UniProtKB/Swiss-Prot annotation:
Domain of life of the native organism: Viruses
Stored PANTHER family: FNIP REPEAT-CONTAINING PROTEIN, FNIP REPEAT-CONTAINING PROTEIN-RELATED
Protein name: Putative FNIP repeat-containing protein L415
FNIP repeat residue intervals: 148-185
Species of the source: Acanthamoeba polyphaga mimivirus (APMV)
Amino acid sequence: MNIVEMLCTDVIVYMMDYLSDIDKINFLKTCSSFYNHRFCVKFNDFHSFDKIRDLDYSENFKRIVFTKTKNNVKSFTLNNSYDRIPIDAKHLIIGKLFKLSLENIIPRGITHLTIEEEYGSEINPGIINPEEIPDIVTYLNIKSRNIFIKKGAIPDSVTHLYFGSDYLSKDIIPKNVVYLRFGDFSRCVIGQRLVETRQVNDITVTTTRIESYIPESVACLHLGFSMSNKCLGERIIETQEMDGEKINTTKIVSYIPKNVTCLTIFNEVYKNTFDFIPKNVTKLNLFGEIMEMIDETIIPKNITTLGLACYRDLNKIKIPKKVTRLNFLFEEYMSNPKVLDIPEHITTISLKYTHDIFKKVVFNNILNLKIDSYYFEKKLYLPNSIKTLTIYGNYDKKVIKKLPNTINTLIFKHK
């Protein structure tokens, strides 16, 4: 009898416990008899999902690495009128040195268009006219504050719009935009108040309504640093005069469309800020300074993801139990020796920038952590509760070696 046939499954599995994953695979491939035992062997090291997904025993791999790369669109920066735009370029960047009008400049093959901050400062006037931007462009990034955009200049094909200009009025933003981000230093307003007075049966009726410049199609809205709190909406006082007596009624109306589900605010946050947040918002980023204590009853009930500027803000806001994901934006070196607790109902934490937060914040039930790759340049601590780790950066084997054994899923995500 062949010695291979004498080894039962239990013996083979026991032997596998003393081998690395690579050695296990090499051993199983020695002969067909051993290979038939592959469904009984567990693999404990990290393996790329792309390499194991087609294996019939892929479920036996406990720790998996996912790599999410950014779509590479060929780009070209236009700085001079004599520059030749490549035929295969899809992303055109109007550089800071370009000083001409955009008329007859942008080829029809361009799907992504970026206009840099300095463009328009030396053009008098700095205007974008209709039909200058092709109706094939879907991603438009207007960084310049010096540009006046005429009605119809932004084509209906645009779905993702970064609006850095200070000048905005009705019907400038097309109705197909789903992602709208205003520039960090853009000072434009997003709506206006309209007052109408009329006589009804010898009664003077004053009606106030608002007109938002943001289309109903927008689902994700990002308001910049320099935009006033008045951008959120209006408190309207309507007055009716009956039998010589004036009756006032107050109505709160928001400039933010009802269909917005993701909202980012960089303004100072007060209790009345929440009066203008639509009920459909599920992801709310409060990246401005919180000026008052915020009770959980004030926060809209549908919010499941909450973003804060820094983890010190945990002292200023009581997070509702329905919120399961918490995002921190800024890095902060805490001088306060007090240790902060993350609420037990939070299961996912995302850290944009961070010092060694884990020395100052207690993580209770955090299963998912999202963090920048530079965090691993030092030997720093990760909570043992983490099961899924997302790293914003490129795939790095050195990082994998620093991770605790408790992590089962690792995701490298392009910034």
